[in-house]
Amino acid sequence: AGLNPIAIEDLTGFPEMMDGRVKTLHPAVHGGVLARRDLETHMASMAEHNIAPIDLVCVNLYPFEQTIRREGVSEPEAIEQIDIGGPALVRSAAKNHPFVAVVTMPSQYDSLVTELSQHDGCTSFALRRELASAAFARTAEYDATIAAWMSGTSGTTFPSVLRLNYVGQHQLRYGENPHQAAAVY
């Protein structure tokens, strides 16, 4: 596909540690993602610390949701599937969407590839904004799932906060009245 990926250790100059728990939480990664390209001070900091700009972040979060659905999964197994660096990286990229595209689901790959091929390897602000919105929704869903699981395993009958995620099914022609928009979730 014309990509030249490099190992995270080569980017950071620092090896993975703590059984892979610490990989991407590094200024060479987050600095490259969070730097505003329109601020001279940000660009000067990047140059001073030899940080390259990162324009595209693609993260598939650890499969926590699938792990806790498995029969007989232990609490330590589930906890090891709680992604820390992935959501942090996703949120960094989504925050800086005026300059960075963030992809969080394989279903987004085709639209990204189409956009890149149509815009000489670049993405439009509209796509970056759409992807950022989806990224924040994904990390919110991920965190809500973790919170619900932890609440359910702590012996609490009812969680103090209950978050529900609804998936859009389709848009309706109109709402209760013809001038209103509506959708089914």
Model-identified regions with their sequence ranges:
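Glycine-rich nucleotide/cofactor/substrate-binding loop typically near the N-terminus or early
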Residues: 2-64
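Residue-level detector of functional hotspots within protein domains
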Residues: 19, 42-43, 68, 73, ...
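Electropositive phosphate-/nucleotide-binding environments in soluble metabolic enzymes
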Residues: 23, 27, 36, 40, ...
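Active-site loops and adjacent core secondary-structure elements that bind or stabilize anionic groups
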Residues: 17, 108-185
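Short coil/turn connectors at secondary-structure junctions
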Residues: 2-4, 27-30, 51-56, 65, ...
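A short, charged helix-loop
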Residues: 56-80, 84-123, 185
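A short linear-motif detector with a strong N-terminal bias
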Residues: 9-14, 35-38, 79-82, 126, ...
